[in-house]
Structures are given as C-alpha cells and as structure tokens.
Design a protein with these regions (language model features):
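Recognition helix of helix-turn-helix DNA-binding domains
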Residues: 212-214
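A generic fold-level signal
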Residues: 13-16, 36, 61, 84-86, ...
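A hydrophobic/aromatic-rich effector-binding and dimerization subdomain
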Residues: 2-13, 73-135, 166-167
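Generic protein-terminus/edge-of-domain signal
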Residues: 1-66, 73-76, 108
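Residue-level recognition of the GNAT/N-acetyltransferase active site
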Residues: 55, 95, 195
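Short, Lys/Arg-enriched, Trp-marked, Pro/Gly-tolerant hinge/linker segments that flank
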Residues: 122-128, 141-206, 210
Length: 214
C-alpha cells in the first residue's frame, strides 16, 4: 500500500494569540489525518466506539476521552463503531513556546514532564476527566475567550492534568479488536480510508492545507 498524505494544517491561532478554544457538537468524524505545530488538548464526550489515531497509536475510545498531543504529531479520529449521537468536542490549541520562559522553573516541572510525554500523545484517566470537565466547559463557554482570566484558567487546567498519575503515554500499538489484524497494513489501511474519504468531500475553497508525506 502506498504512503498516505498527511495534511499540514494551518490553525486559526495567530502569533499574537496565547491559545485558542473551540467547542462544537459533532455528528461524526471525517477530517483526515493531519498535523500542525501547535500543542492540542482535545476533549470528547459521547463518542464511544470511535477510533483515535495519534502518531502510530490506534485505539478505540470510551464515552469520555481527553488527550494532549504535541505539535508535529499526526492525529485523526474515525467513526468505527461510534453511533455518532450527541458527540461534543472541546479543542484547545496553544503555541509550543507559550511557557518557554517559565517551563524550567520549579513550579512548572510537572507540566514540563507532561509536555515531553505528549510527543507521542498523552491520554488522561477517566477520574481526571470527570474532575476537570467543568473547568474545560467554563473555559470554552466564556464570552471573552481572550481574557487574561481565561489564560490563568488554562494554566490551572494544564497544571491539574500534569498531576494525573494515571495518565498514559500512547505507544505504537493497535488495541482495536478485529479492526485490522495485519500489523503491516493496520495503520496504512485506516489512514488511507480517512484520506480517501476526505478527498471525496474536499473543495477548491479549502486553502489552508498542504500535503506532506509521512
């Protein structure tokens, strides 16, 4: 099977922004495998049965999912067994350099470790997700998303997440039973499916994506 293009996304996050928050209901997943240079914290609810692809990791997710993805790490979701009813997503993107002047300070040590572990994707425990849900919603529902208060909220959220001792670093493993048992083709088949189905929907109006090769 040939190599699959990975779309290079230009996010709406500008050099003048500290971070970007997006929340949206979803009726399914059809965005292709993509990569961008910003860190991304992605929260999903009511998406049990969907597949999460981060780097070379392929996993079927539960009804709650929260993952931190470092910049430059390819990622995507696929419907798989998800009934796609009432899916809700919160996505937070921030520059890798946001905490550069602070990250080596003692108070930020756990956050630094968390960011390092996010290079292959970092999934948080269900207990942590249940404890942080309200803070994520408060951040995403604020009518002044650029406020300094929201920046402090983001720092608090990241600090709390960095203390999750049950957080799990993703590895190059396919844990989806009966999805694709061929180790050689498992990733290529999933990624090619996402890519080809997206190409059927793409229009000339989309200008912010440039294919790069894995």
């Amino acid at each position: 099977m040939g190599k699959v293009d990975v779309l290079k996304e230009t996010t709406p996050l500008s050099s003048e922004d500290c971070f970007l928050v997006m929340q949206r209901p979803k009726s399914g997943f059809n965005f292709p495998l993509h990569v961008h240079m910003e860190f991304e914290l992605n929260y999903l609810e009511n998406a049990a049965g969907a597949i999460r692809i981060v780097g070379d990791s392929v996993e079927e997710i539960d009804d709650l999912d929260l993952v931190l993805i470092a910049g430059g790490t390819k990622h995507a979701y696929s419907n798989h067994k998800c009934p796609c009813n009432g899916i809700f997503e919160i996505t937070i993107q921030f520059h890798k350099s946001l905490f550069d002047s602070l990250i080596n300070r003692r108070h930020f040590k756990t956050m630094k470790d968390m960011f390092d572990n996010a290079s292959s994707g970092l999934v948080f425990s269900r207990e942590m997700i249940l404890g942080i849900q309200d803070k994520l919603r408060m951040l995403s529902n604020d009518n002044k998303p650029d406020s300094f208060k929201n920046l402090l909220r983001l720092v608090e959220i990241l600090k709390i997440l960095s203390l999750d001792k049950a957080a799990r670093r993703l590895n190059a493993v396919n844990t989806v039973k009966n999805y694709n048992n061929n180790d050689t083709d498992r990733l290529d088949s999933i990624m090619l499916y996402l890519h080809e189905n997206y190409q059927k929907r793409i229009t000339p109006k989309i200008r912010n994506y440039h294919p790069i090769h894995d």
